[in-house]
Curated annotation (Swiss-Prot):
One of its GO terms (molecular function) is manganese ion binding. It comes from Bacillus cereus (strain ATCC 10987 / NRS 248). Mn(2+) 1 binds at H9, D13, D75. The keyword Hydrolase applies. SUPFAM superfamilies: DHH phosphoesterases. It is an enzyme of class 3 (hydrolase). This is Probable manganese-dependent inorganic pyrophosphatase.
Length: 309
């Protein structure tokens, strides 16, 4: 049987990795030869979840057409966030919870996108719809994905469906969602030992906003100053990325997981759009973004609107 690769976006977060594992397992149960893979390094937060539930992480691939003809995308759809040679393979399915942009196919496909906080929430439904029992380890990974995407249920992207799914999955996994979740988020917020290049690419996504090319990277921290003490070095590596990729804006967002506020570091010739979008003034290229924790709901649409205004 021909193999199908299942993967999330570049610079994968916990949902991208864990949903690839969970969906590949569901597809295997349904008779498909599916393998989860990843398009980037595994973060400290995701590694914590994999270690806790004793699951091996997916192998890394840069290209997919050299291995398979067919792929399944989870937790993304935009071409620039996907495999480098995504145009050379057929996308069979997409399971996602983000905006739909820069995506088209030559054939009809199964496309499932729901306005929930996490891909794993959708997968929880799909396991039930197919009458497949979720293994304890996989339930733990799916729970981890929801906790990560919802910032332990505090993000405005978090829905009642996400909370309900998390409670169900926690029961299957045999953990307390709140206690486990805090430990996992703290592990993700431990940025010691990371280079500046790693920091700005841990969870970075590229977007087309009107005519502007924008990259938004986000890291969680227990104290934003732990990250911003390296601002000069960060600006140097960000400026290099801006030049290399021809970006109009690189927004590096440091989110405090205790206060649920963020600080944005904006570099690029369109940095002023951040000021317009949030009605703030950049001082030394930074501004506090009160109550902003979600890239998907509080950054991407706000900036997109500002660029198109």
């Amino acid at each position: 049987m021909e193999k199908v690769l299942v993967f999330g976006h570049k610079n994968p977060d916990t949902d991208a990795i864990c949903s690839a594992i969970a969906y590949a397992e569901l597809k295997k149960e349904l008779g498909m030869n599916a393998e989860p893979v990843r398009l980037g390094e595994i973060s400290g937060e995701t590694q914590f979840a994999l270690d806790y539930f004793k699951v091996e992480g997916p192998r890394f691939v840069e290209t997919v057409a050299n291995e398979v003809d067919n792929v399944i995308l989870v937790d993304h759809n935009e071409r620039q966030q996907s495999a480098n040679d995504i145009e050379s393979v057929r996308v069979l399915e997409v399971i996602d919870h983000h905006r739909i942009a820069n995506f088209e196919t030559s054939d009809p496909i199964y496309y499932r996108c729901e306005p929930v906080g996490c891909t794993a929430t959708i997968l929880n439904k799909m396991y039930k719809e197919n009458g497949i029992t979720i293994r304890k380890e996989v339930a733990g990974l799916m729970l981890s994905a929801i906790i990560s995407d919802s910032l332990l249920f505090k993000s405005p992207t978090c829905t009642e469906q996400d909370v309900a799914a998390a409670r169900e999955l926690a029961e299957i996994a045999g953990v307390d969602a709140d206690n486990y979740g805090l430990e996992m988020l703290k592990a993700g917020a431990d940025l010691s030992g990371k280079t500046m290049e790693q920091l700005i690419s841990l969870d970075a996504k590229e977007f087309q906003m009107g005519n502007a090319k924008v990259e938004i990277a986000q890291v969680n921290a227990v104290d934003t100053n732990d990250v911003l003490v390296h601002q000069a070095e960060l600006e140097k590596v960000i400026s290099a990325v801006v030049e290399e990729k021809g970006l109009d804006l690189f927004l590096f967002v440091v989110t405090d997981i205790l206060t649920n506020d963020s600080v944005g570091l904006a570099i690029g010739n369109a940095a002023n759009v951040v000021e317009k979008a949030y009605n703030v003034s950049l001082e030394n290229n930074t501004a506090t973004l009160k109550g902003v924790v979600s890239r998907k709901k509080q950054i991407v649409p706000v900036l997109t609107e500002a660029f198109q205004a």
